[in-house]
Curated annotation (Swiss-Prot):
This is Peptide chain release factor 1. The lineage of its organism: Bacteria, Pseudomonadati, Pseudomonadota, Alphaproteobacteria, Rickettsiales. GO terms for molecular function: translation release factor activity, codon specific. It comes from Rickettsia massiliae (strain Mtu5). It is found in: Cytoplasm. NCBIfam families: prfA (TIGR00019), PRK00591.1 (NF001859). Peptide chain release factor 1 directs the termination of translation in response to the peptide chain termination codons UAG and UAA. Residues 280-293 have a biased composition (Basic and acidic residues). The modification N5-methylglutamine is found at Q233. Belongs to the prokaryotic/mitochondrial release factor family.
Amino acid sequence: MRFSDNLAKILDKYENLGNKLSSGIMGDEFVKASKEYAELEDVVAKIKEYNKAKSELEEANNFKLEVGLDNATLEMIEDEIHTLENSLPKLERAVKIALLPKDDADSKSAIIEVRAGSGGEEAALFAAVLFNMYQRYAELKGWRFEILAISDTGIGGYKEASASIKGKDVFSKLKFESGVHRVQRVPETESQGRIHTSAATVAVLPEAEEVDIQIEDKDLRIDTYRASGAGGQHVNTTDSAVRITHIPTGITVALQDEKSQHKNKAKALKILRARIYEEERRKKEQERADSRRGQVGSGDRSERIRTYNFPQGRVSDHRINLTLYKIDEVVKNGQLDEFVEALIADDEAKKLLGIYSKNTA
């Protein structure tokens, strides 16, 4: 089917859905039609803009052929034709991107987990820096950042930390943060001024609701124990800490941040549900990605994705070869949008290339 025919079908479907909604349908039929109609609004707006530019270009070319036009009018028409010819490829690409299959999880909130990697205490300090960076970014975006658990080292570092980030399309913005982040800087304890390299890993999971993942009580093993602080000392005398294991998958979550066992259990279940949902997503995505290497969801988190070089004041994303020389704005102020938008654009380009290659093979 030709591209233009496909667009015409979408416009017809949108119009039919609009007529259907105006006809007085009710109940589940109305809910289903409303959802479909809303999902098409963005792509329909882009199709109409694209078709309008095509129509205007055709009219301008026809007008140019008319006899008796003066030079000033011809020059004006040629300028318009030049402008329209330049805009059409961009408008067509915008339509194609809008038509790309959507990740069902993109609209969801997210759970972010940061863990210290290689590098000892310096890695733990860097993990804390990353965690705070994401908190600043969430504040800039107007999202709600709720700390779920922090395992600190006692001197400002985090062995691991997790948070729930609630808002519209959070996962679509943060999903490319998953991977190994590397830092290069001179530790405060380094007397010789030598640069040390350490790392932390970030995992971003779509926050799953109960409707997304049904967890049976019989599939859970719940252990309780006394919470411990830094150095292993017990910080309270009740069994408030909780460890929940999902028996079918072997996924385990342990939480001890709250003094209440009930609160620890609720938070642990939230993280567990997200991890199970992400595991199922990755399996399905892997099946789809077998024929398009390099797509999000390939399951490879071992690759270093970004380096934060403090002496040079730069942050480099190795996946898209983007380097920004404003490390304080990124790390301290959470200004991540340049990376986020570039990564989204790169992902869209790869998907378009995959579809094009598939259709022309």
